[in-house]
Amino acid sequence: MTKNLDSYFKGKRALVTGGMGFIGSNLAIRLARAGAQVTILDSMITDYGGNEYNLAPVKNEVRINYCDIRDENAVNYLVREQDYVFHLAGQVCHLMSLTNPFPDISINITGTAIVMEALRKYNPDAIVVYTGTRGQYGSAVSFPVNEEAPTNPKGIYEISNLTAEKIIKVYNDVHKIRSVLLRLSNIYGPRSQMKHSRFGVANWFVRLAMDNDEIQLFGDGSILRDFCYVDDTVDAILRSAVTEAAYGEIFNVGSDIPVPFRELVETIINVAKRGSWKFAEFSPERKAQEPGDFYSDISKIEKFVGWRPTTSLTDGIAKTIEFYDAHRDHYWKKTSTEDKTVEAAKLAPAAKCQ
């Protein structure tokens, strides 16, 4: 890449589905600041992570559409004339999918098909970047996990992400809609929802520490994960979008530095200077769902795209806490119903170990 990354997007049109969510809003802000003409598509479904305040830094610089990716007429209209489509909308909670799989099937699978079919009909020259999940692999058979590893997802959410990825791959291969397929590991940082424990373990642990609450650490704390700061993730998304060699490829986005959960928790508490933790026993149900150790092989995206994460865990946690300290009211603020949900989440088993 011979010029500044942001310069590739100056004056370009970019559609971000799920653009008021955690990663989508950070991406939209980066694009707007780079001079792109940004369109947001977000249905703002309750408890799915969307937050209008996420876009506060660029609220007058982006075009926001409150609609669902399953609305064919809206999607058909919005994809027209876009240079880039960053597809991040979806139901993103593993635990919710265990008791109600239909949003995953409807939003993640059908919604993705609607987006891709709209592009085929009305804008086949657009470049697509899709963000899936490392959960598509299921339990790892060797480490670090590369893109050739078998995919044996353990839940409906992960199955829906894998299916959406395969749908997009077909449109790339058959209909020549240039697409990049990313499998994200454990992403953390500013602008995540912080009202309940269902989305992302690292951010939820940050909330518990900031509230000076006790974090439950299941097992012996030795389970390994890789954690990637959201700004690094956005950088991977943008770099892959402008790299021709990346089109049609699958890439892991994470860190090749595995971190035991105990180290994660201790880092959060040390940086926050509050909070505590204790060991807890796995319930039989949680133990059956736990995939065990996971950390990514990111050598492929480094080779093709030139991307590596640059934010250390300690620095990323510090930036995350600094953000929520400054903007707490917009993420902790609750209705009476949400207040009960948060208290229940604090009393329930710890956040899903993504």
Protein language model annotation of sequence segments:
Residues 27, 33, 67, 210-354:
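C-terminal substrate-binding subdomain of Rossmann-fold SDR/epimerase-dehydratase oxidoreductases
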Residues 46, 193, 197-201, 260:
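Short acidic-hydrophobic sequence patches enriched in Asp/Glu that either
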Residues 147, 158, 196-199, 295:
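Short, conserved loop/turn and helix-capping segments at secondary-structure boundaries
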Residues 97, 149, 179-194, 204-228, ...:
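A conserved pocket-lining segment of Rossmann-fold NAD(P)-dependent short-chain dehydrogenase/reductase
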Residues 163, 167, 171, 201, ...:
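Hydrophobic alpha-helix immediately C-terminal to the catalytic Tyr-X-X-X-Lys motif of short-chain
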Residues 99-100, 142, 156, 192-197, ...:
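Short, solvent-exposed loop/turn segments at secondary-structure boundaries
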Residues 52, 203, 234-238:
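Short alpha-helix within the catalytic core of nucleotide-sugar-dependent glycosyltransferases
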Residues 1-187, 326-327, 336-348, 352-354:
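N-terminal Rossmann-like NAD(P)+-binding domain of SDR-like oxidoreductases, especially those catalyzing
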